[in-house]
Amino acid sequence: MHTPGMTAGLLAVLLAGVLHAAEPLRVEVSRDAWISAYPTEQEGNNGGASKLKLKGNQEFFLIDFDATKFRGKRVVRASLHVKLEAAIPLGRTTVSTIAQEWVEGKGSSYAKEPGATSFRWARNGDQRWNGDGKDITAMTLGLGGSIWGFGDPTPPDANRWQVIPIDPAVVQARLDGRSYGFFVMDDVGSEYQRDGDKFTYTLFPNRYVASKDSNRKSSPYFTLWLEDGPAAPAPQVKADAYQAPKAPVTLPAVPKLPSAETSVTATDALGLPIPGLRLFAAKGEAVTMLLSSPPAKVTIDLPHRRYDLPKVGAHVDPLKASPNGRLLEFQIPKDAKPGEHRGMLRLDGQDVPFFVHVWNFTLPDQLSFIAQMNGYGLHDTSRDWFRLAHEHRLTLNILPYGWTGRVSAAPKLRPDGSFDWKQWDDRFGPMLDGSAFADLPRGPVPTEALYLPLNENWPMNHEQHFKGGYWIEDAYDPAYWQTFRTAADGFAKHFAERGWKETMFEFYLNNKVYFKDGQNGKPGNWKACSAPWIFDEPMHTQDFWAIRRFGLEFWQAVAPYKDVRIAYRMDISRPEWQRDLLDGVSNVDVVAGVLRDYPARVIGRNRRDGKLTYMYGGPSKLGQPLVINVAWCAETWALGADGVVPWQTIGDKDSLTKPDELAVLYPGPDGPLPSLRLKAFRAGQQLAEYLTIYSQASGQDRDAVGAAVLALPGLRAGTIKTYDDDAGSSAFGDGAARSVAELRLRLGAWLDAQAPAPRARWHDPRPTRQDPSHLRPIVALPAPTTR
C-alpha cells in the first residue's frame, strides 16, 4: 500500500476509526477469471472454471464488481472475501487495479478461447495488452497507470473463508473509472517448514478459492465501506518509463578491402577467416591471428606476443605464452602510426607477408561498456587474476562469500565491531588506486567494480537475530539492522578516507533459501545456507520485499559519503514481477536473457533511475563459435545496456585436463591463463567501444544506432535455458558472424576517416547513487477486523 509516512499500526487504528462513519456493504462479484503465466498456459483462459487459483508468480485471478452504482462515493475501507477450496490457506496477497479492459471468457483447463483474456492477451488473438504489449504485467502492479496494495488476510474461519484487505485507493480507482477491475496475486509463493535444522521446501503450492461459477454460498464477494462526498486525491502514479523504439539509422557502408591471395589460412578473435592475412585495429586495441601451424619467425614493427593452444579433451581454449606459439596477438600502441604495417611470417621455409592496418582513432582507457568476468569461491585472490582481466579490457569480480555467508576476503572484525583494514588494503588497495595496473595497456585505471563482503550473515550473526517468517519487517530485531548499518558506514567511510572514488563498490546478496533444500534424496538442512529468502534472482514478492529492505538500510548507512561510488547490485531474472519495489533502491541491475523480452521496460526504467544495466548469461561453450561472445556484447549494447556478465568464468584445478564449459580464465601452474573465449570477450568489448565512439562522433542517437545493429542478420538472439533458473546461453541466428565482422569494418573505416580526437572515456556507464528517502513508503495492510 502506498501510504506516505504511515505505519501498519497507525493504519489499522485509522481504518478502525472510520467504521462508525460508514457501514459495510456486501457487493457481489460480476466477473472473474483465472489466468496463468506458466509457459505452456500463457494463452489459457479459465473464466468458466468453478475455482480461482493463486500460485506465486505463476497463476492469478482477475475479479470485478459492477461499479456504476457507486459512482461519486468515497471508499474508506474494502475487502475481498474468498472461500478456500484447498488445504493451503492464503498468505499475504496483492490486489492491483487493471488499467485495460478485459474479457472474462468461459474457458476451463486453460482453454485458448478466442477473444477471452489470458496472461498474454487482453483478448486472445485480437488485442494485446497495452504498454510494451508483453503480458498483463504491463497493465497491473504499478504499470500502465495501475496502482496496487498488499496485505495479510484473516486466518481461515470455521467455514474456510478468508478476508483479503484491499487498499481503498485501489477500489476508488474502480469507482472513478480509472480501472477495469482487480488483479489478485499470491505474494508468498513457495513455502518452507523448519523443525530445528530439518528443512522442507514446498515449491509453488496451489492455493484455490471458489469462483463465482461455483455456487452462491461459496462465491467470492466484496465488502465496501463507502461515504458520500469527494474522494481523496488519486495517488500520484509514476509514468511508465518505456524506452521508446527508435527508427534505425543507416550504418556506414561496408568498405571494399584490397584483394589479396594467400595460401595461408588464419582466423581472428571472432574465429572468422582473415582475408589476405590483413588485420584492422584502432590505436589502443588488441587483435589476434590464429595460424594452423606456428611460424618459425614473426617480424613487424608492432608489439606482439605468441601463445600455444594445448588441447583440453577435443577442444582448444586455454592459452600458454610461448615464443613458438601459433596464436599471434598484436597490441596496438596509442602512438602507433595510422595506416598499413607490413609484417612477415616465416612458414615452411617461406616468407609470407601479412598486414595490420591501424585506423586513425583510439580506444579509451576508461571503459564505456563493461564486460564483467564473474567468479565465485576463488581462494587465490592474487592480483595476477585481476591484471589478466584488466589487460584484456575486462573486469574481474569475485564474490567473497559462499552459501553460508562466511567471508573469504574481508577486513578483520575487532571485538568492538570496528574493522582492521591493514591486510585488506594491502590486498585490494593497489587495484582501487590503479597502481596494480600501471604497466598494462590501459595504464593505472582502477578496477571498475568490486564486491563488498557484506551479506545477510556478515558481519551480523543471522541466527542470533532471525525471528522467522516470510516478511522481513518482522524477521529481525533492531540490533541486526544496527550492526548492518554500522558495517556499511564503515566501508563507505574508509573508501572516502582513502580517496578510492573510481571503483563501484557493490553490496550484493547472492544466496537463496532453497539452497537449504535437500539434494539427491538427502534431507534439507537449515544451516546449509544463511538466506531465508531468494536474494539472487528473486522470485516471489516476499523476496523482492526483503531485498528492498536491505537496500533502504544500506543507502541510509552510506548516505554521508557522497563521493564514493557505492552500488546496490542485484541479479534479476524476472523483471516483470519486481513492480516498483526496486525503483530508487538498486542501482546495478544484472538482468538475465529475459532482457531480450522486456528491453523497453527494463532499459527505460533503469535509465530513468540512473541505474547501470548488465545482461548476464553463460559464455560460449567449448566448440561453439567464438563470435557468440562478441555478438553478445554488440547485441547487449544495441539493446541499451551497459555491459555483459558471464556468470562464472574461473576454472578449477581440473579445467586444463577436463573440458570446462565455464572456464574463461584458467588456473595454470605458474598463474592464471587466458583463453580464446577470453579474447573473444575482449573483441566484444572493443566492438562496443566502436559503437559508442561512432554514436558520439556521428551525432547519431545511441538507440537508433542500436536499432540498426539489431536489424542486421542474425543479431537478435534467443536465450537457451535447460531449467528455470539456468543463466542461459545466447543463440544467434544465421548471418550473425558476417554481420559482426562487417559491423566492425563499417564503423572502423568510418572512424578512421573522421579521426576523432582521443578521449579518456567516451561514455560513463557507472550508476548514480540512490536516495530512497524520497520514495513513498510501502506498507502492508493488516488483516481485516472480524466485522
Which residues does each predicted region cover?
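Beta-strand-rich interaction/scaffold domains
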Residues: 87-172
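A short beta-strand-loop element at or near the start of a globular domain
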Residues: 35-91
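Catalytic domains of carbohydrate-active enzymes that cleave complex glycans
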Residues: 454-465, 472, 476-480, 484-581, ...
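Surface-exposed binding patches on compact interaction domains or structured appendages
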Residues: 241-275, 286, 294-328
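Aromatic-lined carbohydrate-binding surfaces of glycoside hydrolases
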Residues: 306-308, 330-334, 342-561, 569-583, ...
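Catalytic-core region of carbohydrate-active enzymes that cleave or remodel glycosidic bonds
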Residues: 586-656
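Proprotein-processing/basic-patch segments
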Residues: 165-236
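Short, surface-exposed loop/turn segments at beta-strand-coil junctions that are enriched for proline
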Residues: 68-72, 169-173, 331-338
